[in-house]
Structures are given as structure tokens and as C-alpha cells.
């Protein structure tokens, strides 16, 4: 018997995802046509012996989250429950707080997945490795180049046994080119060391600032507190993957993750990819079109385009490397490149909405998406263009490398600006 835990965080996280996270919780943002965490749930549901999936976070159980959970339970025929933290408890604190629910039924092991990662989720391979050599902690790792490794948790392993000898979260100097993917397989006994850390922090009064509202509530961070302390003690091991993987921290990384998942659909869900049909729009590359969307036959879509529910795409529209969300309208002959068009937004005819991609170096197989700051030297860096929900773009204007907050009605062109 197996279980899975998906750590979805809370509204105090995901600030780099704004303005998209204003409308829906970040874990429910559509990536390649389905909510971000549905990719996680699909992967977990395919593991033989999976009995229950638990979501742990600090979001209020509002209507979108409740509706998603009900639909997911029906689709995957698995119990899927949301466990709300009383305060933000960190990646390890939530596991310890809900340890009784996780261990109920006596699971052999349980997966722990961070919600803000994109991956092909090699969970069965991790389970095989765990059963071959059972250990308390098994981490999924991948490789990064020397420069980018500093932005992740770095793992020094024993090449023969794959034991984690040393772990450093976001080191200041190069430690290792093996990085933590944020996907784990834990044995039930892992909750004992979490309890020791919890008690130690309680006794020492070492509480995170986020827990001050609840005196006595301990925050435990798996990466900084647990992995760093237990590395080299024969408890933590790493399973390396060369499959797809990326963090989803910013809106730009969501667009890149959508591209990765759309490419995966060729193997996993070919039925989700649009096909070129007589009288239909021209499809180039991997494109997802929701069944309720209305797309004019003269539109040209792709590659790497995701069109959401109820979207209207007019005659002569050109769409490339973009996400168009629920209820948006692209009027005749608009051009949308490297952009995200928000819920219910309208782009006027002959308008152009364009961004600048910040993709990994295609010549470096170990390169990953950078989650850089929006600004450098007081100037907005060129990035993808984001239209918040219910934005109105007039006809014949250019919106380039800009972020438009929700409910704005523009009257002219903008370049390299945040429109509040």
C-alpha cells in the first residue's frame, strides 16, 4: 500500500506568480490545459498500489479547490483529500503535523511532491529503487550546470551507493552539479526524525517568523533542516533522472513548463493534442485546444500553444508559445507571441501582444529555467507578456514585454512596463 502527499503551499507563497495567482491558487493554474497539480495526481494514480493522495497546504478550501478535488476523485477513482495547516509549517512541518493521516492504514512508503515542479515523475522507478534497497529518505535528483546549481539544493552523492553524503540548499559556491528535484519517497520511519527536529525547535524556541501568530507552532524545512543535518548518516539516498524537469516559480516558467508537458503528451496523452483537420485551424507543433473553444479556420496556432475553456479565436489570428486562459477573446488578425492572456481578457483586432522568452540555453543539455528578478538596475527586464484577468487591449496597439494587472482597459501601446 502506498500514499502520496502533494505540498501545495499557501497564498503567502507564489508572489512571483502574480498577477496570475490573484485569480486562482497557483497549484490550480492551467499548465498544458490542466491544473498544475493534476499532472502530479495523474502520475501518482498510475503507481500500482496507490491508495490515497493527500494535499497539504495553507490555502482556504474555497470553491475552485473543492471543485477540483471532487472532479479529480471521480476521474482517478482515488480518495484525494486536502489537509489545511493551521499556520504555514514549512515543507516538513506539515508532514509531521498530519503524520497520523499519512500513516493511517499502514502504508509501505509515501511519495512527497512539491506542487511547483514540472516533471515526467519517474515514481515507479523510484519505488523500484526503494524496494531494491530500502532507506528512510529517497530524493529524486537531476543535473544542472555549475552556475545554475547555486539556485537549487545541491547533493553530493557516493557514486557507488548513491548515498547523500552532503546537502546544501542554494550554496554560495559550487558544491555539486546534482540538484534536488523536490520529489521524494519516504519510509514511515522518516517521521521520527521530523519529530526530533520539531521538539528541538520547540525547546530552543527557534520558531520561524511565519509561525509567530501561533506560539508553539514549529516550522520544519525538509531541505535546510532535515536533509542537511542527516546527510552522511546512511539515511538519505538519491535517485538520478535524465527526464524532463523544471521549477514553476514565475509566470515565464509556467509557459516553459507548458511546452514540456505538451511535448510529453505525444507519449502520454496524444488525445489532448490538436490535429489538423479539413476546415479547421492550421496546427503547427504541439497545441492543446479545449473542446469548448471556438477557433476560426484561418487562425494559425503553434507551436506550444494552450487554449482554455470558452476561448474565442478570430479569423487570421497568429498564436505561438502562449497560454490563453478561460473565456478570453482574440479578435481578428491579432498576433500573440510568448505571452499569457488572462481569464476573460480581450485583445482587439490587429493588435500585437508579444514577450521575450527566458528559456534555458538550448545548447546546454543541463541548463534549466532561470527564476530571475523582474528588475535589474531599476529597469524591468525583458520577459514574457502577461495580461491579468479581464484586461481589454484596444485594436492596432503593441503590448511588448509588459505585465498588465487585472481589470485594466488600455488605450495605447506599452513597452517594458508594469501597468498597475
UniProtKB/Swiss-Prot annotation:
It comes from the Eukaryota. Gene3D superfamilies: Hexapeptide repeat proteins, Spore Coat Polysaccharide Biosynthesis Protein SpsA, Chain A. GDP-alpha-D-mannose binds at residues 85, 247. Its main location: cytoplasm. Keywords: Cytoplasm. Belongs to the transferase hexapeptide repeat family. This is Mannose-1-phosphate guanylyltransferase regulatory subunit alpha.
Amino acid at each position: 500500500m502506498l500514499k502520496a502527499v502533494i505540498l501545495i503551499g499557501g497564498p503567502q507563497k507564489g508572489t512571483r506568480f502574480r498577477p496570475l495567482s490573484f485569480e486562482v491558487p497557483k497549484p490550480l493554474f492551467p499548465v498544458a490545459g490542466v491544473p498544475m497539480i493534476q499532472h502530479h495526481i495523474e502520475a501518482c494514480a498510475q503507481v500500482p498500489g496507490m491508495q490515497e493522495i493527500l494535499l497539504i497546504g495553507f490555502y482556504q478550501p474555497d470553491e475552485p479547490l473543492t471543485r477540483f478535488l471532487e472532479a479529480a476523485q471521480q476521474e482517478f477513482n482515488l480518495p484525494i483529500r486536502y489537509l489545511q495547516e493551521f499556520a504555514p509549517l514549512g515543507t516538513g512541518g506539515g508532514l509531521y503535523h498530519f503524520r497520523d493521516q499519512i500513516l493511517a492504514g499502514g502504508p509501505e512508503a509515501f511519495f512527497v511532491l512539491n506542487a511547483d515542479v514540472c516533471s515526467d515523475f519517474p515514481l515507479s522507478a523510484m519505488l523500484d529503487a526503494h524496494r531494491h534497497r530500502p532507506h528512510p529518505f529517497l530524493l529524486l535528483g537531476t543535473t544542472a550546470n555549475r552556475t545554475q546549481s547555486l539556485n537549487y539544493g545541491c547533493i553530493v552523492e557516493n557514486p557507488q551507493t548513491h548515498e547523500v553524503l552532503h546537502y546544501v540548499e542554494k550554496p554560495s559556491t559550487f558544491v555539486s552539479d546534482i540538484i534536488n528535484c523536490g520529489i521524494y519517497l519516504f519510509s514511515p520511519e522518516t517521521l521520527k526524525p521530523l519529530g526530533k527536529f520539531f521538539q528541538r525547535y520547540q525547546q530552543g524556541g527557534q520558531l520561524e517568523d511565519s509561525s509567530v501568530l501561533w506560539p508553539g507552532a514549529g516550522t520544519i524545512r525538509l531541505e535546510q533542516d532535515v536533509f542537511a543535518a542527516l546527510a552522511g548518516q546512511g539515511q538519505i539516498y538519491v535517485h538520478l533522472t535524465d527526464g524532463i524537469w523544471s521549477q514553476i516559480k514565475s509566470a515565464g516558467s509556467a509557459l516553459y513548463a507548458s511546452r514540456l508537458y505538451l511535448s510529453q503528451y505525444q507519449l502520454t496523452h496524444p488525445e489532448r493534442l490538436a490535429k489538423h483537420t479539413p476546415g479547421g485551424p492550421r496546427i503547427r507543433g504541439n497545441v492543446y485546444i479545449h473542446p469548448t473553444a471556438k477557433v476560426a479556420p484561418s487562425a494559425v496556432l503553434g507551436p506550444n500553444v494552450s487554449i482554455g475553456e470558452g476561448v474565442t479565436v478570430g479569423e487570421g489570428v497568429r498564436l505561438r508559445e502562449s497560454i490563453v486562459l478561460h473565456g478570453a477573446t482574440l479578435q481578428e488578425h491579432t498576433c500573440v507571441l510568448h505571452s499569457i492572456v488572462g481569464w476573460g481578457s480581450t485583445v482587439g483586432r490587429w493588435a500585437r501582444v508579444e514577450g521575450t522568452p527566458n528559456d534555458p540555453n538550448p545548447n546546454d543539455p543541463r541548463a534549466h529555467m532561470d527564476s530571475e528578478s523582474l528588475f535589474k538596475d531599476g529597469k524591468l527586464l525583458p520577459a514574457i507578456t502577461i495580461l491579468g484577468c479581464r484586461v481589454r487591449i484596444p485594436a492596432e496597439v503593441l503590448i511588448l514585454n509588459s505585465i498588465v494587472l487585472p481589470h485594466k482597459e488600455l488605450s495605447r501601446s506599452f513597452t517594458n512596463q508594469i501597468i498597475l
